[in-house]
Amino acid sequence: MEFKIEKKGTNKAIIEVEVEAEKFEEGLQKSYLKNAKYFKIPGFRPGKAPRSLIERAYGEEVFYDDAIDYVLNETYPKVIEESKLEVVSRPEVDIVQVGKGKSFIYKAEVYVKPEFELGQYKGVEITKIEYPVAEEEVEHELEHLREENARFVPVERPVENGDIVTIDFEGFVDGEPINGGSAKDYELTIGSNTFIPGFEEQLIGMNKGEEKEIEVTFPEDYQEPSLAGKKATFKVKVKDIKVKELPELDDEFAKDVSEFETLEELKANIRNRIREKNDKRAKDEMIDAILEKIAQNTSIDIPEPMIENQINYYVEDVARNLQYFGMTYERYLQAIGKTDKEFRSQFRERAEKAVRNNLILEKIAKVENIQATEEELQKELERLAKMYNLEVDKLKERLSEDDIEYIKEGIILNKAIDFIYENAKIISEDNQGENQEN
């Protein structure tokens, strides 16, 4: 087998492959053994007629299709491996020469990772981003902790706004029970707008043990079309009324919800966690700004299949999340009134940016000879094993060579990100002109 490569622009290649006649003959024989049973030849049982008789009766090309597929599947992966091309698309194949006793020649046109010259990536100048910790953030976290540790206390009085009521209910439209429109011991927070408009308001003033019929109208845009705009009657019984009591913010509260002895220690811990989160956000935004500046000085002709593959990744991620909530991707598209094409289009700009940044980082890693060390790989495997609650050795058993390479690539990209950040000129807004080196 021989092949030659012709580069087409910065992101395409045409590979011409010549395969020896014996290989194509091997494919013809395999095609014959696979398909002989489908041909009828007088005097022979299905599958027993000689190949030469079938070819004479149906034409020499009768076994070509499967033979061609066999030769392509046998030779194309080897060509890509030997050529060292970084192919990012399926090949468009054109058969140049085919026939018994002849060498088999084909051309494969493919998209490859684009060739490009890097713009300036060291000493990129950006403005420092900072997000100081606001006391409002600390107070918000404390309130969240109070909510999580709230007590629900029964009260002997009529229902008020904000109460948590336990109810039995059964809904009817035109005198017929609503499918899925009933429940027992259902907890509802009055004022949460969980139910149909008007339902919760009519519970206000009811007492424990009281029963009542509530009249409501389903919204015109209700998710179940058969109920949209319909008047409904709900038979409701209030079984319990509770109020939410939030704990006092004091040292006892801090002891109950954390390992700290005082409220001030808890606040300090919350403040530090917020600071870490804010610092990470600021760093991520500065890295994004550095990559944007590098991209402005770097021209890359990104192959369309790379963008489409990235969009596929985003859409598949959405579909997986929807599945978790019991909804299909198709039903979701119907609910939001978009076609697959329209939905995919909203990810295009994000996908282009992600692919572009990865290409830039890969190139920087190559130029700067950034590698993933065995120690770094082991550390990442330990992190993944902990995340999946596995022993490291068990995780390794499950990972293929491709999986390991993918993990290494992730380490290299992260090191390339660290490299451009550490080599940037970060200027404080308070001191324009004064470089804040990392």
Curated annotation (Swiss-Prot):
A GO term for molecular function: ribosome binding
Compartments in which it is found: Cytoplasm
Chief site of localization: cytoplasm
Matches recorded under InterPro entries: PPIase_dom_sf, PPIase_FKBP_dom, Trig_fac, Trigger_fac_C, Trigger_fac_C_sf, Trigger_fac_ribosome-bd_bac, Trigger_fac_ribosome-bd_sf, Trigger_fact/SurA_dom_sf
GO cellular component: cytoplasm
Alphabetical list of HAMAP family matching this protein: Trigger_factor_Tig
Function: Involved in protein export. Acts as a chaperone by maintaining the newly synthesized protein in an open conformation. Functions as a peptidyl-prolyl cis-trans isomerase.
Protein name: Trigger factor
Species of provenance: Caldicellulosiruptor bescii (strain ATCC BAA-1888 / DSM 6725 / KCTC 15123 / Z-1320)
